[in-house]
């Protein structure tokens, strides 16, 4: 019989293909003796089987899930569905590749009216009990039954307005009990049946919902953008709840062992008291910096710092962690190698070598070459970018950052640039005739076209920032204006483009030039030291060739001569040659082209 379910004590970090990244790391943390609430993982193979069985969980998988629940009951001393001493669980997704925020989570599963009443009395904390229940109804309705969050948020906002408070935490137990009743009524109105009270039914529906979320639109987009195969499937992690919302001696947080933006070595993260995990991410309340946790929970913070050190030393990489503090006791809910900027990736890789955790070869292998490309182009000033909000997003067709005054024709781009203006060329689409304007512009924005359009290909070749295919733009070329995000832009107005992300910003955001120095220089030096291939460049002009040599190229590998004929009168001679109807006409055109080409190579 196939094994579809693994307890955390049965897995390890090497089983991520089967257990997913989250499940494998929960098992690894358990093996390391760290404080992890116990649970089990339903494998990625079970997800694949679910789809093969027509989006149904078969009896064999269902049986193994319930066997694992029995084992959890034995470990915890609690009973699933029992009113007196209930086992409450979270149900989370966990693909083998990290997909933050792409799939779904359900907390506090196992609650019903009877259990909540008992918990309310037994804990002496009715507010906590009803808060858990209203959260569970909202999550289950949204994730499992696809009743939108907005309906429940509207009820919460109405309740806060009636009570004259601004924060969810200011609602008392009676308020939350009323909300739970309103939520159940909303559920019945939308679904046509009562909210399920049987924890086993709740669990199976939640597992199916997580499997389903592997195929949701945002997960599909993320997989496509990050080359993650659909066939991998997701695992499901069922874990005993640790409660961060039981009072002021409880809390929840997300932290990195190093700063994911800069790579600086030091704890970076956020923390909320009397809250559950999604509150930090959702921005329901403004979280505190992780350092403030030391004042609130000194013992838990001391233990957390030790856990961070253990995990980073064990994984030999910067870690991204989720945790909960329940009555001063620390529980680890997740760890994974943290996402980071290209700049941070370089610093972290170099620091890990200096700290003796990685070899030079390993440090080079840690760097995603696709991210390095963004460092070779001008970048927005980090502080200024943090304060800016994009007004639209299209295709990041050519990396880098650009800001300047809007122009609508290639000729205007040349003219404005010659008098010292920095310009962004905005076109419906570009053509070869626009090449001079494209060269004069700081950046290019097109309404039509994709990653392989003329604008994208030429811009990448020139190292010019380009955002293409912004279909939200309503263009009026005749009057030199366009409308975007409800605002009308005219020639001379300022915009900023991020060719790495495709984001478009109103106004000017300061940029800084890229340099190969510091950590970038060290990594590239190590790459040169250990590589077995020579690196040459594609270059069509002396300026391109010079820049390539500055960036480490050893010579010219490809020179596409046709690109030399995009400028001035050259393109006319080239067209004469192509359109020539007689040998004499062709030879006459070639006679014009030959000295130009000879001059380029000389």
Q: What do the PLM-derived regions correspond to, one by one?
A:
Residues 1-388, 421-424, 431-436, 442, ...:
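Nucleotide/phosphate-binding sheet-loop regions of phosphoryl- and nucleotidyl-transfer enzymes
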Residues 283-285, 347-352, 447-448, 513-528:
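A signal for specific C-terminal beta-sheet/loop modules enriched in small/flexible residues
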Residues 333-335, 490-538, 544:
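C-terminal domain-closing interface element
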Residues 357-441, 503-508, 520, 524-528, ...:
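Protease-associated
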Residues 393, 397-492, 501, 564:
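Conserved structured catalytic cores and adjacent interaction surfaces
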Residues 447, 467-469, 497-498, 538, ...:
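Generic beta-sheet signal
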């Amino acid at each position: 019989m196939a094994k579809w379910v693994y307890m955390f004590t049965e897995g390890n970090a090497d089983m991520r293909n089967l257990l997913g990244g989250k499940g494998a790391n929960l098992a690894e943390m358990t093996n390391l003796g760290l404080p992890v609430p116990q649970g089990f993982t339903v494998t990625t193979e079970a997800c694949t089987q679910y789809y093969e069985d027509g989006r149904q969980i078969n009896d064999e998988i269902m049986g193994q899930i319930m066997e694992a629940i029995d084992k959890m009951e034995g470990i915890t001393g609690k009973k699933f569905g029992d009113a007196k001493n209930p086992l409450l669980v979270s149900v989370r997704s966990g693909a083998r590749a990290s997909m933050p925020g792409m799939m779904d989570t359900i907390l506090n599963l196992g609650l019903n009216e009877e259990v909540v009443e008992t918990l309310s009395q037994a804990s002496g904390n009715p507010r906590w009990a009803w808060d858990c229940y209203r959260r569970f109804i909202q999550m289950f309705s949204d994730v499992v039954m696809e009743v939108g969050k907005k309906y429940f948020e509207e009820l919460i906002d109405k309740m806060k307005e009636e009570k004259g408070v601004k924060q969810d935490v200011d609602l008392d137990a009676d308020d939350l009990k009323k909300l739970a009743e309103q939520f159940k009524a909303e559920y019945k109105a939308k679904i046509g049946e009562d909210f399920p009270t049987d924890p086993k039914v709740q669990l199976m529906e939640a597992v199916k919902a997580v499997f389903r979320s592997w195929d949701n639109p945002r997960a599909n987009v993320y997989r496509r953008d990050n080359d993650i195969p659909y066939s991998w499937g997701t695992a499901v992690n069922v874990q005993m709840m640790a409660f961060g919302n039981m009072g002021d001696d409880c809390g929840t947080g997300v932290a990195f062992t190093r700063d994911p933006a800069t790579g600086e070595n030091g704890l970076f993260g956020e923390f909320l008291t009397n809250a559950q995990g999604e509150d930090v991410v959702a921005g329901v309340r403004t979280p505190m910096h992780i350092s403030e946790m030391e004042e609130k929970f000194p013992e838990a913070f001391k233990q957390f710092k030790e856990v961070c050190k253990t995990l980073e030393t064990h994984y030999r990489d910067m870690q991204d962690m989720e945790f909960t503090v329940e009555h001063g006791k620390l529980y680890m809910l997740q760890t994974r190698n943290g996402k980071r900027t290209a700049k941070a990736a370089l610093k972290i890789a170099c620091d890990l070598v200096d700290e003796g955790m990685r070899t030079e070869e390993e440090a080079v292998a840690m760097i995603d070459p696709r991210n390095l490309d963004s460092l070779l182009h001008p970048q927005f000033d980090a502080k200024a970018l943090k304060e800016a909000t994009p007004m639209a997003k299209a295709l990041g067709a050519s990396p880098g950052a650009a800001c300047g005054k809007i122009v609508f024709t290639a000729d205007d781009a040349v003219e404005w640039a010659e008098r010292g203006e920095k310009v962004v060329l905005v076109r419906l689409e570009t053509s070869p005739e626009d090449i001079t304007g494209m060269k004069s512009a700081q950046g290019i924005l097109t309404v039509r076209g994709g990653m392989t359009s003329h604008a994208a290909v030429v811009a990448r070749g020139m190292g010019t920032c380009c955002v293409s295919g912004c279909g939200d733009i309503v263009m009026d070329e005749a009057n030199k204006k366009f409308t975007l995000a409800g605002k009308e832009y005219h020639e001379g107005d300022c915009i900023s483009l991020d060719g790495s992300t495709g984001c478009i910003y109103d106004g000017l955001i300061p940029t800084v030039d890229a340099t190969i120095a510091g950590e970038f220089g060290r990594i590239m030096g190590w790459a040169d030291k250990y590589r077995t291939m020579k690196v040459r460049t594609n270059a069509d002009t002396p300026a391109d060739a010079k820049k390539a040599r500055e960036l480490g190229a050893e010579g010219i590998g490809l020179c596409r001569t046709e690109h030399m004929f995009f400028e001035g009168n050259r393109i006319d001679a080239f067209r004469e040659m192509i359109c020539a109807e007689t040998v004499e006409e062709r030879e006459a055109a070639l006679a014009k082209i030959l000295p130009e080409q000879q001059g380029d190579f000389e």
